[in-house]
């Protein structure tokens, strides 16, 4: 059912005058509402909701929530953090991430962001890419023609090493990196389950899964804490992210980060710098293998620009089609597939009065697969992002990294790493999907591709 209401723009934005449509998601069942649909088939459920309005009511048990399905409504939510607060659901993520940038709120978030932002300025990102290129070349140096590998697992292993090198540069051995990766997967999966669980009591029970989660969380933070303490003792500046964080000062107060604050930020960057980028790369290589005509254009562009040498940071702006492939992969398979806010006060959204304490959902999955925003949305079409066609995309329709003051601080670094790794691998190898392989995206803390066996073919 769709209803029409007057446009009531948030004070922080000026949307065009148009009648918003509101509706209710079908299929609600007594007591549970739409909870089971969101649990069992979340991607399909979310992608179906824009057909019911710009703002769609969803029942989560006895509570009402709303999914913002129009880019302008999502912008109003993300650009007005004082009204649309991160909410209690982020408190569960603090078990892993502490009071880091990704979960902090209000003035604390603004304070942290101003301190950390210099670590992601362009000269710093350019410096980090040397480690990315070195680790990628080392990883593919052991590949053999005809070898079958799980590209998802392979990219996660590579990106954990890249993240460790970007953060620490030296002083962390391969065994510790592997242990940290193992712990990170357990804790990341556990955070998602705890965030989505309807009852908070489950995480307090002494189950094998909870004990495994607690051990992994403690060990991961211990590994990072030891690295921080050692770097403080040495006082050395290795030009890596850890050195930048240890020397960070607020531009107005001159205050730096203590070891606990650095620990929280480093763990956050490990999660964001390995899990999300690794999944994106796995999706990219699967899509290239499944679309030979696109792969051929990527190879032709890389060969023309690189002329047989390894790619560098300076080459990336010239790899326009390759970057279009990455953007289209992020559209089809956004790492942050759903997020939420909670209204801190009564407000209006999409022509509806929304009480304080109401959960507001927004979903890149719903936006990116909306045929009104992206014609033929299930089609893999990198040319959407080239030339005049890219200008036709509605503002805010693409949302892989969020928006506003809470937009992912490392988005440029993530895109840079992804493009550099794709160009490095594609300059030397083709990856062919094993016949019969079916891509089944797994919505967890981030959208993961699941196992993707592929066969290596030298170019």
Curated annotation (Swiss-Prot):
Enzyme nomenclature, EC number: 1.14.99.61
Entries under Gene3D superfamilies matching the protein: Cytochrome P450
Keyword Heme: yes
Pfam family for this entry, one: p450
Binding site for heme: 408
Cofactor(s), by name: heme
Residue ranges, annotated region (Disordered): 1-27
Gene Ontology molecular function, alphabetical: heme binding; iron ion binding; monooxygenase activity; oxidoreductase activity, acting on paired donors, with incorporation or reduction of molecular oxygen
Similarity remark: Belongs to the cytochrome P450 family.
PANTHER family per record: BIFUNCTIONAL ALBAFLAVENONE MONOOXYGENASE_TERPENE SYNTHASE, CYTOCHROME P450 FAMILY 4
Role description: Involved in the biosynthesis of cyclooctatin, a potent inhibitor of lysophospholipase. Catalyzes the stereospecific hydroxylation of cyclooctat-9-en-7-ol to form cyclooctat-9-ene-5,7-diol.
Protein name as annotated: Cyclooctat-9-en-7-ol 5-monooxygenase
Annotated gene: cotB3
